[in-house]
Amino acid sequence: MKQMMDAIVKPTAGPGLELRQVPVPVPGPGEVLIKIHKTAICGSDVHIYKWNQWAQQHVKPPQVIGHEYVGEIAELGAGVTGFTVGQRVSGEGHITCGHCRNCHTGNIQWCKHHVGVGVDRDGAFAEYVCIPARNVIAIDESLPEDVVSFFDAFGNATHTALMFPLIGEDVLITGAGPIGIIAGGICKYAGARRVVITDVNEYRLAPALRMGVDAAVNTAKEDLRKVMHEQGLTEGFDVGLEMSGNAAAFHQLISVMRSGGKVSLLGLGDGPISVDMNQIITNGLTLQGIYGRKMDNWHQMSYMVQGGLDLTPVITHRFHYTDFQKGFDAMMSGKSGKVVLDWTK
């Protein structure tokens, strides 16, 4: 095992990232060292690149970033069982305490003591990453690595989309970023009748259509209610997935839900968003906040891909990790889906 490795690092407090040589992590008791094959750039990685307020509050440079990845086990720490060296794996990015009430009920995503890989501790944009064995997820060899590289984001979409029953339902998704687009595919796969996605970025709507949604609406140019009529909706949407964190999108979503409709909220806003409580109460709406993934979502993701859910339309760019700057430029251009970095060459 070599002692030094390439890694994409947040070097100092300020915009930008650097490719540096850093020590290869050594797995302690109960930990697993993973050799990285592919990684994917997440929106939070872009926040760290730009060094926005959220990043300033969470990241302590110098630090290796990144939390979406697939690879193989390189070394097992003392006491680790159930895994083998060379086995293909990914990992849950929230390292949790395991003893709080939420952890005990299986809601690890709400653990108040969680530590984020690539945010609060060194991450996966490197040749190797080290995580606790309980966070390691075995990945079947039949699954394409480019897709598995963004299972973390896929998990957010899965958690959001499957929060409420979908069979025969009409679904509105506000926000056609990669997670929103993936959610559109999940909803159709899970039996939704009509799936409509909205955005004001024309580029993002085309891959949403390739994922199988019934209508992709640019709300800056098109009338959503007209599209609803064309799709045969008479009372509004049964299920809403708010993925944008945008106030205007949220308010429009609430306005077109049927009475008794259910809404999953994943998109984080830049600030507080006002809510008309009277509208929610009188229409009997259910609003559910979504954060991260439940461990069962990892199994659901693998089974959906094995069952035929094709997520490749979400991938728009592929680069070698040494060209990571091109990947971040693509992400920040507003004209990208998932960007995958290759660490195998």
State where each predicted segment sits.
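Helix-to-beta-strand junctions that scaffold the AdoMet/dcAdoMet cofactor pocket
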Residues: 257-258
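Glycine-centered, small-residue-biased loops immediately flanking beta-strands
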Residues: 261
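N-terminal glycine-rich cofactor-binding segment
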Residues: 7-26, 43-75, 90, 111-122
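NAD(P)H dinucleotide-binding glycine-rich loop of Rossmann-like/cofactor-binding domains
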Residues: 97-174
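Glycine-rich beta-strand-centered segment in the early N-terminal region that forms part
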Residues: 25-39, 54-101, 140-142
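C-terminal substrate-binding/catalytic core of Rossmann-like NAD(P)-dependent dehydrogenases/reductases
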Residues: 226-234, 270-317, 325-326, 335-336
